[in-house]
Amino acid sequence: MLENIKQTITRWDERNPWTNVYGLARSIIALSSLLTLLINHPSLIMKPASGISSYPACKMNLSLFCLGENNYMMLNLFRWVCIAILVLVVIGWRPRITGVLHWYVSYSLQSSLIVIDGGEQAAAVMTFLLLPITLTDPRKWHWSTRPIEGKRTLGKITAFISYFVIRIQVAVLYFHSTVAKLSQQEWVDGTAVYYFAQEKTIGFNGFFQALTKPIVTSPFVVIPTWGTLLVQIVIFAALFAPKKHWRLILIIAVFMHEIFAVMLGLISFSIIMAGILILYLTPIDSTIQFTYIRRLLWNKKHKKGEVSV
């Protein structure tokens, strides 16, 4: 056993966990929160709710939005502070610094916003689990693909352990979601999507109700209902699947969440889950080349050069 541990540590020491894979994931997660704050004024996302007379609720709460006076002018100021931090995260500046700030912003949003889709909760958990990776990341930009100089064995061990904990957490999340659904008769008999479509808060709008009515009101409704369960089971099983299957599972999983975004309006949640799934289903020590984007930028630059000549 000790020999296996030694071999694992040796393999980790030869690999690099600080790549643009986790950089892309945290940028996408931050982008979702950034869009939420840019689009919505505090008066829309921080207000009294059922059972809460004043908002944000700050009893035993360390949220950023609870550090000042409870009025919308102060809350709006804090909103812009969060926006500034999230912009730094999205562009990838100093993960070692912005990693902690990103978690605190995510925690503050999860604690203070009136949300119904669970995206902020997922972001708060994931940014916390990313802390051991960000705090040991020596790069100035999390997009950098340059080799890391120097021997950083302890930092690499810490980062890889955190990565595997994240993968287990994501797998458990989908496993728990599947089990919870299977405890409800609507999911077992295949009619759950029909009820979701009719739900007034996050149900289909008039366009999608008309578009999907032939399926949702027919026996074929079992296809999207059981299909959702099947995809979630596959995502959980990806924890044990060979890496060669990860990309296909990632495409299927992200596609499922984007359907949720379009049809149910779960845009914030779906963007956050896309970032989490990239982290879950892409080897952290690999490098995303962004070949198409580089080619596009190069062609534009080359064309400008031709014009100037």
Swiss-Prot record:
NCBIfam families: export_SdpB (TIGR04033). The keyword Membrane applies. This is Uncharacterized protein YitO. The chain crosses the membrane at residues 28-48, 73-93, 113-133, 157-177, 220-240, 259-279. The gene is yitO. It is a multi-pass membrane protein. The lineage of its organism: Bacteria, Bacillati, Bacillota, Bacilli, Bacillales. It is found in: Cell membrane. InterPro entries: HTTM-like (IPR011020), Sporulation_SdpB (IPR023894), Sporulation_signal_mat (IPR052964). Its main location: membrane. Keywords: Cell membrane, Membrane, Transmembrane, Transmembrane helix. One of its GO terms (cellular component) is plasma membrane.
